[in-house]
């Protein structure tokens, strides 16, 4: 993942918060229990936290309120501008992405919500390998994102979206890189992690991976 999604992110920046509040009927189920999902990621994190895809700063704010030290990475200039308006003045957000980033200090937890699907499965593997080198034993990756239990679950979800006339959602599901749990389990385990998957709505699972 380089900068190919930046235009999309910049366009989405000013409407993202309305999306997560369920104002777009096509994405209402995707963002169901949104606040609970963020809280779950926060509760599973500890120490110095590296956040990928800060977006408009919703997860970042909760992490800071919970007392975490947060290093935010966000590729979109528009997203960074909106997040800075919502977050403490002293908080800085660095330009970067899942594969290209700088880390100022040692990291205990790496977090992200609704973003890892921008990477292909091969890129996901490269990213997790990088994170494995960053984290000490006991360090964690906590990602919340749309993934599917298997191919059948994916196929049924796409078909259901089409039948409901949710063509934008169906197109999204077919053009982004929403992966399957067995693929992610293999990626994590091959890179030295023990991982669990917890489903928090029809689309979103929380992946909690601990470095062994």
Curated annotation (Swiss-Prot):
The keyword Coiled coil does not apply. GO terms for biological process: methylation. The keyword Transferase applies. Its EC number is 2.1.1.-. Gene3D superfamilies: Vaccinia Virus protein VP39. Pfam families: Methyltransf_25. GO terms for molecular function: S-adenosylmethionine-dependent methyltransferase activity. It comes from the Bacteria. InterPro entries: Methyltransf_25, SAM-dependent_MTases_sf, Uncharacterised_MeTfrase_YrrT. Keywords: Methyltransferase, S-adenosyl-L-methionine, Transferase. S-adenosyl-L-methionine binds at residues 53, 74, 97. Could be a S-adenosyl-L-methionine-dependent methyltransferase. Belongs to the methyltransferase superfamily. YrrT family. PANTHER family: TRANS-ACONITATE 2-METHYLTRANSFERASE, TRANS-ACONITATE 2-METHYLTRANSFERASE-RELATED. This is Uncharacterized methyltransferase BCE_4457. The lineage of its organism: Bacteria, Bacillati, Bacillota, Bacilli, Bacillales.
